[in-house]
Amino acid sequence: MLLSKAEWDKEQLIRNLREEWGIVDEEPDEGDEDVENSDDAVVMRVGNMMLIVTLFHGHIPDNEAEINAENNYMWPEAIEAAKAHKAHIMVAVLGEEEKLLERGKLFTKAMAVCCKQKYATGVYTSGVVFEPRFYEGLADMIKEDELPIFNWIWFGLYRREGGLNGYTLSLIHI
């Protein structure tokens, strides 16, 4: 999640996870107290998975976000949002015991909640930068018991001499 300012509302994030998706830390562990009490990290156990959401103070290195923002032909402002970001939130879901689909759904839910952060300007995932409200809306498919494939797979288009061509990004991980 790209941010225009190096700030987040950690409590809002935790509240939104609970209220929007019913996600709560199922095994509060005193051993993780240092990380969990950090202003820049949220660590939760959800089923057999661990959800980690971390605020990073700084620009994503090597213009990676800007380069990938060029892939979004549906949101011309993606490049400017990527160039202007001052910080970012990284979401990770760990847990080999859980099926990949369940890990993917948890990741998508957490990213959708990050879209509600005050300074959220772009969602950098799947080799592209999405507009936050667009990503959040697509994630709502999960509430209808549908897979959020448009959050997971970018369907790119490009023109060549023979006409319009298509490609996907992130399909290999599904």
Across the structure, where does each feature detected by a protein language model lie?
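Short cationic amphipathic helices and targeting signals
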Residues: M1-S4, I89-V91
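N-terminal low-complexity, intrinsically disordered segments
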Residues: A6-I79
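Polar/charged alpha-helical tracts
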Residues: E11-R15, E19, E136, D140, ...
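Long, hydrophobic alpha/beta structural blocks
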Residues: V93, Y158-S170
